């Protein structure tokens, strides 16, 4: 192999005409014309068409006839300009081809579990092979094949370029990159830790870091001044569709700074990395206080690409004749809603009443929903007669409503429930009516978070216990005062997604001790968990602050990729499992004994292979009862089963699936080893409603996996009838 001569497939141009080139890569596609063989050869830079003609080299042609998809090969040949009319506009190299004179097969490939080629070899058009048609677990099981796809290679390259841009920018600002420990001490940071048992120190454990929080603060106390790290973090969280147990974040900390320093450098950094994906962000980023975000959007991650902010109208309708409102208000409740501008025609009475009021709003937790339309300067609805003219005018003025607008209102004694329901309705309606601008990115700083919140009757940190209170003087035993304290914390939100957050840190030991006391930690607990950190605060700690940005989530947004799993080389699946390596797996008994962990752990069975238990799933993992089937998991099942239903039907389906979990132990205990598979003999029908015909599928995408297409025809399996 003479790798020094190698030319990349995607870099061949007309300037190479007449030259001998050496190509190496994988067979992407094959087309056999009987007396001439064409292949697409793919490498990291692109695809080139190679022609095997027996008149040029009979031996190479004969060997090429044995090629199959994904064989790794080397081709030597001469570059030629394609004849007019045979160019392929879908390839960067579509104007040239290579006539092979020599072929070396490095290694062969088995039949593929799914198609890798993304550009079928066709004339004058491009047929895309979509990974959406392949089960995600199958893609992850054969991740090394999945990553061969050009689109996945492009994502990994872009990821590298984005991280490179981050490093170069921070280097210009005199930040230095320092690695912090992976094997560290377990400290309370919001999620559960992954624990690592120590062989040397029997019965003791390290913890994998949820973030480098304490170490980066210690670096500031060490005089480092400006630190950053592309940090790997680990959190043993409950399963969520777009979370990973291990993830990457940009971790950053600086001394002798305030919030404005963080805002300035992070805005510039964010603008730069988004530009790598062709996305322009407006500066300066607007800022919104936490209280305003909750009051007007029902979330601390508001999507400000569209309007529909909430308004409280309780004072306007407190004496209304509408008994539902009046009763809720008398019980201390609230009436709140938003205005949908110019959508009275799109949101018909049937849609508002029978869909949103009766089904969709209740699926979000509401007991109902009130709606009104503005028609010819007046409100119209099925309950408007209970409102005086003054109340109607007051509602229109408060919402800024005009002709053609629709008012959506929720009433309840729980203000938290109102915010949650309105937040879900706002996003649902905006998505349904396509009110969210495409290819629009609106960053936002959310600041002045509460320092503490109440969980299960106990005070806990809203972010983490190292955030500077505002003001710093407070009584750690005064519950009312604690819950009224703000913090110098801030989150960066883009299009309703939190990309990161940070704060100005506590740099005085007395203040830090008061926070620990407010959280209910005793002196002994404080010393055991944080004694090393408190001692560092006694030696002239500088004012400091920082931020952490989720690299995976940011890259997914920059590249418009729906799942963070597609921007990570080897991610875990939705159940925190690795279908490729089958991690996590049972440990050998000898390893457990060496770690002094005793016999309370499941071990590999002697003589049964690595995954021998009958109570394991197909990936070799012990079957455990899921806590709850989420709406995202319902949508995933529906997609695999080719089911289509609306939100209210999804809620019913979710309820039915969760009810099955009540029988989990019974089903798990059934011995099905000798039971033969049975045919489904029940009538298959939709029990919710009559089936609705879907849109007709185009033929070409349906046949996109057919291996060959010529003269308008695909080769497909022939049906043999007896």
Question: What is the predicted function of each stretch?
Answer:
Residues 1-621:
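Class II aminoacyl-tRNA synthetase catalytic cores and aaRS-like
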């Amino acid at each position: 192999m003479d790798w020094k001569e190698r030319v990349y497939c995607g870099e061949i141009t007309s300037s190479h005409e007449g030259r001998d080139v050496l190509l190496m890569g994988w067979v992407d596609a094959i087309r056999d014309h009987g007396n001439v063989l064409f292949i697409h050869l793919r490498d990291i830079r692109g695809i080139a068409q190679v022609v095997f003609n027996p008149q040029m080299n009979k031996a190479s042609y004969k060997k090429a006839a044995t090629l199959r998809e994904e064989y790794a090969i080397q081709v030597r040949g001469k570059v030629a300009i394609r004849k007019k009319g045979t160019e392929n506009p879908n390839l960067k190299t579509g104007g040239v081809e290579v006539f092979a004179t020599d072929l070396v097969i490095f290694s062969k490939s088995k039949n593929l579990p799914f198609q890798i080629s993304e550009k079928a070899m066709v004339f004058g058009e491009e047929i895309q092979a979509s990974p959406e048609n392949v089960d995600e677990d199958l893609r992850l099981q054969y991740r090394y094949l999945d990553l061969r796809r050009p689109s996945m290679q492009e994502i990994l390259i872009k990821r590298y370029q984005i991280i490179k841009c981050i490093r170069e920018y921070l280097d210009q600002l005199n930040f230095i990159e320092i690695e912090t420990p992976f094997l560290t001490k377990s400290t309370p940071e919001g999620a559960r830790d992954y624990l690592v048992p120590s062989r040397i120190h029997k019965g003791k454990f390290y913890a994998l870091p949820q973030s480098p929080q304490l170490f980066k603060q210690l670096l500031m106390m060490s005089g480092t001044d400006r630190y950053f790290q592309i940090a790997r973090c680990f959190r043993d969280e409950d399963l969520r569709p777009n979370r990973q147990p291990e993830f990457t974040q940009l971790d950053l900390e600086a001394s002798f700074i305030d919030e404005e320093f963080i805002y300035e450098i992070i805005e510039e950094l964010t603008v730069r990395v988004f530009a790598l994906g062709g996305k322009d962000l407006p500066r300066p980023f607007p800022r919104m206080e936490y209280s305003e975000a909750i009051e007007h959007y029902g979330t601390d991650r508001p999507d400000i690409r569209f309007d529909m902010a909430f308004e409280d109208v309780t004072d306007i309708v407190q004496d209304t004749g509408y008994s539902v409102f009046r009763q809720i208000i008398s019980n201390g409740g609230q009436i709140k809603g938003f205005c949908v501008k110019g959508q009275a025609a799109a949101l018909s009475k049937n849609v508002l009443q029978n869909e949103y009021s009766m089904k969709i709003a209740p699926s979000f937790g509401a007991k109902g929903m009130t709606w009104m339309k503005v028609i010819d300067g007046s409100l119209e609805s099925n309950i408007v007669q209970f409102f005086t003219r003054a109340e109607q005018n007051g509602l229109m003025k408060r919402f800024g409503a005009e002709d053609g607008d629709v008012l959506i209102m929720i009433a309840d004694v729980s203000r938290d429930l109102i915010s949650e329901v309105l937040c879900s309705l706002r996003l649902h309606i905006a998505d349904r009516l396509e009110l969210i601008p495409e290819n629009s990115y609106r960053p936002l700083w959310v600041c002045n978070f509460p320092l503490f919140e109440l969980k299960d009757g106990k005070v806990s940190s809203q972010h983490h216990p190292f955030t500077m209170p505002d003001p710093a003087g407070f009584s750690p035993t005064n519950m009312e005062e604690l819950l009224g304290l703000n913090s110098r914390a801030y989150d960066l939100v883009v299009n309703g997604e939190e990309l990161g957050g940070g704060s100005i840190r506590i740099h005085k030991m007395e203040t830090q001790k008061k926070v620990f006391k407010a959280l209910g930690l005793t002196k002994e607990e404080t010393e055991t968990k944080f004694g090393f950190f408190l001692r560092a605060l006694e030696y002239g700690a500088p004012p400091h602050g920082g931020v952490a940005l989720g690299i995976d989530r940011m890259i997914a947004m920059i590249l418009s990729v729906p799942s963070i799993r597609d921007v990570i080389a080897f991610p875990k699946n939705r159940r925190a499992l690795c279908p490729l390596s089958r991690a996590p797996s049972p440990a050998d008994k000898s390893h457990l004994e060496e770690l002094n962990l005793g016999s309370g752990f499941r071990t590999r069975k002697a003589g049964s292979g690595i995954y021998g238990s009958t109570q394991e799933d197909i990936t070799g993992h012990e079957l455990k009862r899921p806590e709850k089937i989420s709406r995202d998991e319902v949508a995933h099942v529906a997609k695999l089963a080719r089911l289509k239903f609306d939100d209210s039907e999804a809620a019913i389906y979710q309820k039915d699936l969760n009810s099955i979990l009540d029988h989990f132990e019974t089903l798990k205990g059934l011995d099905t080893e000798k039971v033969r598979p049975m045919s489904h003999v029940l009538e298959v029908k939709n029990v919710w409603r009559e089936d609705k015909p879907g849109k007709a599928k185009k033929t070409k995408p349906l046949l996109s996996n057919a291996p060959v297409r010529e003269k308008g025809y695909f080769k497909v399996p022939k049906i043999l009838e007896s």
